[in-house]
């Protein structure tokens, strides 16, 4: 089975890829996983039937066009398409529904699932405390234990304070420089992450959707005329 992952950035890509591979392995399904990171989240275009702007590079800006292309090439084949991103300051339920609606419209012949981490992908990493501690044995366990799972609290900043000695300096620097560190944390922590042990509600929503799709990758959408 083929799994294609569209992610908003490189740090999210490695986490989702490794977790998807481990979930599939636990379910006894052999998969080939391809990951396609983008430059940020962006927003769904007002005219989703139009070609994207020439220099568009964010996930949602390109999503309708990419869904059309995937449906043309892979429609009806043994494939799962994962759309993975952070909810940031959006309402997770509303954003998830918008993405599923877009997928049903432009890729009705492909089984698509949404991996939406609450606020940021670091919520999924913080959902596996053992993985954080294994990756960074000298981490601040007091800060780790005080984190309220999947709360909107500046999640990457929490992880930064858990694992970095110069956290406040890094937080002050912020974007775009922090992107390098976020990718490093994701690469390191995801090596140790175990799907069955993760307590993040948003991760477990994704996990159950993927398990369901692995058992029956038939598209759940009926063709409709828009």
Feature locations, PLM:
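Conserved SAM-binding loop
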Residues: 5
